Amino acid sequence: MSHFFAYLSRMRFVRRWGLMRNTYDENLQEHTLQVAMVAHALAVIRNRMFEGTVNPERAAALALFHDAEEVLTGDVVAPIKHFSHKIRRAHLEVAGVARQKLYAMLPAAIRKDFRPLLFEEKADQPEWQVVHAADKLCAYLKCVEEIRAGNEDFAKAAAVLKQQVESIRLPEVAYFLETFAPSFAMTLDELNQSEPRPRRPQLRSQ
């Protein structure tokens, strides 16, 4: 018997942004899905527009496990995680131990297939690059949505994360920020009003 997927299913109980007042709570499972979608998109954008060779499906798969250790450790808020180099190193060590524990839960017959999903390997470096960018992007987009809802508690985090995202030297990230990010600051009515209307098909005269 393996507890691996039973633990992963508990992502939905891991609350993010624990020290912040949220207009809506975001759990780890929701965040993970969004990161997977954005990582896939970044890979596609790089390939189609910037002559990249990233595997979009691989990036999405890696993203599904990018915070897997938090089902054991919980979400450690950024101010604590980055308080000092010593604490940052300790956090990385704890995360590594948690990932090893999850990995050990897998049946031996399939364990090697999951290892690259739980531990970064050089062969997947291009895919992990877009996953990490997507992770940062999604944190910024959460802040944008909170500010749109009138929650100024996220204003400072939004400013810091925007600066961090803009400093990522990946053209696909800049494209995503310009093309997709502005819509996250809009209400549903605004999205509906600005949505391009489908063109009516031209009927041929008999």
Question: Language-model features: where?
Answer:
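Alpha-helical, largely C-terminal catalytic domains
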Residues: 1-206
